[in-house]
C-alpha cells in the first residue's frame, strides 16, 4: 500500500551497486599532496624501531610517497635522514619528533606512537611546501582519547531495506589507500555491523551455516587493518530480542522476559538466567578466540531495541518483565548482562574492549532509573553516551531542545555531563557525529573544524577516553576527520589550547601560505552554522538534505515528508509543518537567512583562492563542498519562503502572491543549474551513508528543473481560473470538508465531531469492553505549522492519556488541553469523548477557518484511519499521511 508520497517500509531489500559510485574507485588511490615547488636532494628512512611484524611498513611508505612528491630521491647515503627509535613513554601512542640539520628522529615506546610521529612528519613537510622542517624543533604529543572509531563511508548497514552482510560479500570495503588515509587522520578503530549468533558458537544452538565464511572474512579484514594501526570492532545490539518461534525460546523459556516488548512481538533476555549468561559468554569467547586481532565490541545495551527485560524506551517507568523474580535493580540487570559479555571477550582476547553504548537520543530527559546508569558498569566495561542528545540552545530568543546528534551544538548536553561526572577518573566513551550528520547529510564534511576543537576540548576536560566519531553517515575521510585526529592529541595536560592555533595547524598542510584566509572562512562558516534550527524534527525532515527533490506544490497537497535515511522513501512532499518542530515557519526562515548571510562572508574569504588551486583536485573538491552547501541553504530558504507565500495565497485568498512564488521557482532553477557541474565533478556530493545511495545527482537535478517547469504550469492554471484560490482547492478535491455525522472507522467503532462553546469534541462509539490505542492528528490547513498528535489508550475499560507529539518537539509532554470523558459507561456500546479548547489546537486564521484532522484506531496489530489508509511508520511522525486528512470548519 502506498499512501501520499512515501512508500511504506516492507520486505523489499536493496543491494547497492558500488560500481555506480566513482568515489568507491577513487578511494582506492593513495592521496599525495601537490607541491608547487619541486625540491632537490636525497633522503633516507632508517627503521630503527623494532618492528618484527612489519606493522609500520605502511607508514614508512607514506613518508616516502610524500618526500618523492616533493621532489626528493631516496638514497642510502642521503644527507637528510628520518630515523625511528625506541624510547620509553608514559602513554601509549605518544611520540616525539626531534629535528636537526641532518634530519629528524622520531621516538616512541610503541609502534603506534612511531606511526603517529611518521604521519606528523608528513604533515609538517606539506605545511612547509615540501621543505624539511627547521632544525632545532622538538615536538611531542600524547593522545587523551585511547580509542577513536571511524568507518568505511559505504560499508553495509545490514538492515532492511539495505540488508547486506559485508562478511558474506567479496567486496573489499577497506582498500589500503582508505586505511592509510583513515590512520593518517587519527582513526585507530573501525566498526562493522554484526549479529552475535551468526559469528559465534554456543553449546545451546547449532552453528549458523555461514559462520565459517564470516569468520574467515572477519579475520582477513582484522589482520589487514592492523597493518595500519587500526583495530576492528564489532557493532551489535545484544542480546538481541527474539520472537516466540525462536528455538531457544521454545526450549528454554526461563531465559526470556515474561512479557513481549511494547510492540507485543519480541521478548528480551533474562540476565539472571545462568543459560543467558552462558549463551553470551560462549558466543563472544569463540569469536575472540578465533580472531584475537579484533579490537573489541561496541554494543547498544539500552535504547535502540529490546535487549534484556528492561524497557527499551528510557522515558518509561521501570517495569521489569520478570519470570525469575531475581529482585535486581535496572543497574544490576545491565551489569550482569555486560559482565557475561565482557568475560567472554576477555577469555578470547584479554586486550579487547567492550564498549556499552547507551543510545538515549531523545530530546526529553530519561526516567530516573536510567540516570547514573554508568555507575553499574563491570570493571573493564566502557560506557558510551551521546554527547549532544537532550542539549539546550538559545535561538531567536527561545530555548530549544535537541535530540540525537548535532554538529552545530557544541555540547555537552547536561545528561552527558552528569554521566561523565559519575565516571570521573574511569574510562568513558562519547558518541559524536562530526563529518556530516542528520542536520545535513549529503557532503563528506561540513567545514566547521572550530566546532571540533570546542567539542574535543570538553571531552578532555571531562576525562573522556574513547570516542565513536560517526554513525552510518559522515565517514568520508576529509578535513573534519583530520581535525578530530588533531584534537585527540595534546602536548600536555592543558585543556586551554588556543582555537586559532589549532585551526592554523590544521589548515597549513593543505593550504600553506593561504591558511590564514581559510581559517577566517572556517570561522565564518562556524558562526553561520550556529543558526541551523536546533530541532530534531527539522534535522530529520527539512529540505536541506535533498532540496532539489522537493517539488513546488502551488496547491496545498500536504504530501508527507520522507525520511532521507530510508532509500525506499519517495523524497519531497510539501507538508512542511512536519519538519518545523519547535520553530514557526517564520523562525526557520529567519534562521536560514542569518545562516546564509554569514556563509556568504566565509565564501568571500575562500573563493579568491579558487583560481590559484585550479588543477589541485582535493582543493577543488573543498571549494565544491562549500559551494554546494551554500546552494543547499539557499534552496532550503527558497522553499521556506515559498511555503510561507503559499500560506498567504490561501489565507488571504489573493492570487497576487503567485508572482513572487513563481519568481522563487525560477531562482531555484538557477540554483539547480549551478549545482550540476559540482555534482558531476564529485560523486560524494548527495551521497547518504545510511541510505547507501545518492539522494540526488546531476541527473535528478536536471529532472528537478523540468519538474519546476510543470509546477509553473499549475501556477498559471490557478492564476487564470475564474475561481478564487480556496475555491479551487476544494473544487480539485485537495481539501475535503468533514461533515459532523457518525462515520464508521472500524467494525463496531464509529466517530463524529462536535464544535461548541469554544471546544472541539471527538466522540467515539465503541464496545464497552474494547481495548485500543487512539491517535488524534491535527495540522493547520496550509500545512505550515507543526502537527499535533495526541495518544490515548483504553485498557480494561479505562482511558489513559499516553503522550503527545510535543514530547519530540519541545522535549516534554506538553499540555494540548485534551480532556477525556465517557457517556453510557454501563451499556454494551459506550461513547468516549475527547475534547480540546480550540485555542489549544494548531492556530487557525479566521480568514481560512479550517483545521486538518484525522484519527487512527489501533486494534491489536491492525490500524484503521478515519480518512485514507495511512502509511508506513515514520520516525517522530507516526503512521499519518497529512495528505489524507479532512478539513474541520472552525468557527472564528
Residue ranges, per PLM feature:
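Acidic/polar low-complexity flexible segments
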Residues: 737-745, 775-799, 841-892
Amino acid at each position: 500500500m502506498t499512501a501520499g508520497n512515501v512508500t511504506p517500509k516492507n520486505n523489499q531489500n536493496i543491494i547497492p551497486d558500488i560500481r555506480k559510485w566513482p568515489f568507491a574507485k577513487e578511494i582506492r588511490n593513495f592521496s599525495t599532496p601537490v607541491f608547487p615547488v619541486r625540491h632537490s636532494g636525497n633522503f633516507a628512512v632508517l627503521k630503527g624501531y623494532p618492528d618484527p611484524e612489519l606493522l609500520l611498513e605502511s607508514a614508512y611508505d607514506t613518508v616516502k610517497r610524500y618526500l618523492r612528491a616533493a621532489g626528493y630521491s631516496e638514497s642510502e647515503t642521503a644527507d637528510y635522514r628520518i630515523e625511528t627509535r625506541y624510547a620509553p613513554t608514559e602513554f601509549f601512542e605518544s611520540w616525539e619528533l626531534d629535528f636537526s640539520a641532518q634530519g629528524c628522529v622520531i621516538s616512541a615506546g610503541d609502534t603506534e606512537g612511531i606511526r603517529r610521529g611518521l604521519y606528523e612528519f608528513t604533515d609538517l613537510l606539506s605545511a612547509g611546501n615540501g621543505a624539511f622542517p627547521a632544525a632545532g624543533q622538538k615536538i611531542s604529543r600524547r593522545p587523551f582519547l585511547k580509542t577513536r572509531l571511524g568507518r568505511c563511508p559505504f560499508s553495509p548497514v545490514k538492515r532492511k531495506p539495505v540488508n547486506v552482510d559485508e562478511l558474506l560479500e567479496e567486496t573489499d570495503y577497506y582498500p589500503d589507500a582508505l586505511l592509510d588515509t583513515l590512520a593518517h587522520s587519527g582513526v585507530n578503530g573501525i566498526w562493522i555491523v554484526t549479529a552475535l549468533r551468526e559469528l559465534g558458537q554456543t553449546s545451546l544452538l547449532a552453528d549458523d551455516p555461514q559462520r565459517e565464511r564470516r569468520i574467515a572474512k572477519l579475520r582477513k579484514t582484522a589482520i589487514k587493518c592492523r597493518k595500519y594501526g587500526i583495530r576492528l570492532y564489532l557493532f551489535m545490539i545484544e542480546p538481541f530480542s527474539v520472537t516466540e518461534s525462536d528455538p531457544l525460546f521454545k526450549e528454554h523459556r526461563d531465559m526470556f522476559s515474561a512479557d513481549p516488548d511494547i510492540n507485543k512481538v519480541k521478548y528480551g533476555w533474562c540476565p539472571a538466567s545462568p543459560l543467558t549468561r552462558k549463551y553470551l559468554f560462549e558466543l563472544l569467547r569463540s569469536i575472540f578466540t578465533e580472531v584475537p586481532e579484533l579490537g573489541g565490541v561496541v554494543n547498544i545495551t539500552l535504547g535502540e531495541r529490546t535487549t534484556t527485560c528492561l524497557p527499551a524506551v528510557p522515558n518509561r517507568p521501570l517495569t521489569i518483565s520478570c519470570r525469575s523474580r531475581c529482585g535486581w535493580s535496572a543497574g544490576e540487570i545491565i551489569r550482569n548482562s555486560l559482565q557475561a559479555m565482557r568475560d567472554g571477550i576477555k577469555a578470547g582476547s584479554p586486550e579487547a574492549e567492550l564498549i556499552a553504548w547507551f543510545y538515549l537520543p531523545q530530546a526529553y530527559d530519561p526516567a530516573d532509573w536510567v540516570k547514573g546508569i554508568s555507575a553499574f558498569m563491570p570493571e573493564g566495561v566502557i560506557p558510551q553516551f551521546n554527547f549532544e542528545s537532550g542539549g539546550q540552545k538559545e535561538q531567536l530568543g527561545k530555548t530549544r531542545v535537541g535530540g540525537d546528534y548535532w554538529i552545530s551544538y557544541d555540547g555537552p548536553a547536561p545528561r552527558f555531563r552528569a554521566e561523565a561526572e559519575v565516571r570521573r577518573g574511569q574510562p568513558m566513551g562519547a558518541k559524536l557525529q562530526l563529518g556530516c550528520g542528520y542536520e545535513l547529510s549529503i557532503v563528506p564534511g561540513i567545514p566547521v573544524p572550530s566546532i571540533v576543537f570546542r567539542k574535543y576540548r570538553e571531552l578532555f576536560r571531562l576525562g573522556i577516553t574513547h570516542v565513536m566519531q560517526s554513525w552510518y553517515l559522515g565517514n568520508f575521510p576529509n578535513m573534519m576527520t583530520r581535525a578530530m585526529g588533531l584534537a585527540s592529541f595534546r602536548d600536555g595536560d592543558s585543556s586551554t589550547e588556543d582555537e586559532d592555533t589549532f585551526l592554523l595547524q590544521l589548515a597549513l598542510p593543505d593550504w600553506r601560505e593561504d591558511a590564514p584566509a581559510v581559517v577566517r572562512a572556517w570561522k565564518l562558516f562556524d558562526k553561520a552554522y550556529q543558526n541551523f534550527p536546533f530541532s530534531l524534527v527539522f534535522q530529520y525532515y527539512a529540505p536541506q538534505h535533498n532540496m532539489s527533490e522537493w517539488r513546488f506544490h502551488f496547491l496545498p497537497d500536504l504530501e508527507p515528508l520522507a525520511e532521507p535515511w530510508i532509500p525506499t522513501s519517495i523524497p519531497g512532499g510539501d507538508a512542511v509543518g512536519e519538519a518545523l518542530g519547535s520553530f514557526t515557519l517564520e523562525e526557520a526562515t529567519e534562521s536560514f537567512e542569518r545562516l546564509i548571510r554569514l556563509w556568504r562572508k566565509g565564501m568571500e574569504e575562500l573563493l579568491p583562492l579558487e583560481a590559484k588551486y585550479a588543477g589541485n583536485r582535493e582543493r577543488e573538491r573543498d571549494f565544491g563542498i562549500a559551494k554546494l552547501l551554500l546552494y543547499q541553504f539557499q534552496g532550503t530558504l527558497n522553499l521556506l519562503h515559498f511555503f510561507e507565500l503559499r500560506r498567504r495565497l490561501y489565507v488571504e485568498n489573493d492570487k497576487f502572491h503567485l508572482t513572487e512564488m513563481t519568481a522563487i521557482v525560477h531562482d531555484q532553477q538557477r540554483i539547480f543549474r549551478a549545482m550540476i557541474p559540482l555534482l558531476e565533478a564529485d560523486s560524494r556530493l548527495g551521497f547518504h551513508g545510511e541510505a547507501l545511495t545518492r539522494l540526488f545527482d546531476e541527473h535528478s537535478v536536471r529532472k528537478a528543473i523540468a519538474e519546476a517547469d510543470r509546477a509553473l504550469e499549475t501556477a498559471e492554471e490557478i492564476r487564470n481560473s475564474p475561481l478564487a484560490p480556496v475555491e479551487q482547492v476544494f473544487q480539485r478535491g485537495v481539501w475535503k470538508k468533514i461533515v459532523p455525522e457518525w462515520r464508521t472507522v472500524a467494525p463496531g467503532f464509529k466517530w463524529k465531531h462536535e464544535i461548541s462553546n469554544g471546544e472541539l469534541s471527538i466522540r467515539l462509539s465503541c464496545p464497552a469492553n474494547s481495548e485500543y490505542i487512539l491517535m488524534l492528528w491535527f495540522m493547520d490547513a496550509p500545512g505550515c505549522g507543526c502537527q499535533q498528535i495526541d495518544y490515548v489508550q483504553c485498557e480494561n475499560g479505562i482511558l489513559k492519556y499516553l503522550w503527545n507529539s510535543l514530547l519530540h518537539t519541545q522535549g516534554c509532554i506538553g499540555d494540548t488541553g485534551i480532556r477525556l470523558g465517557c457517556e453510557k459507561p454501563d451499556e454494551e456500546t459506550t461513547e468516549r469523548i475527547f475534547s480540546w479548547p480550540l485555542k489549544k489546537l494548531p492556530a487557525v486564521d479566521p480568514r481560512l477557518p479550517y483545521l486538518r484532522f484525522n484519527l487512527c484506531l489501533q486494534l491489536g496489530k491492525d490500524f484503521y484511519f478515519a480518512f485514507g489508509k495511512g502509511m508506513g511508520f515514520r520516525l517522530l511522525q507516526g503512521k499519518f499521511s497529512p495528505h489524507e486528512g479532512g478539513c474541520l470548519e472552525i468557527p472564528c
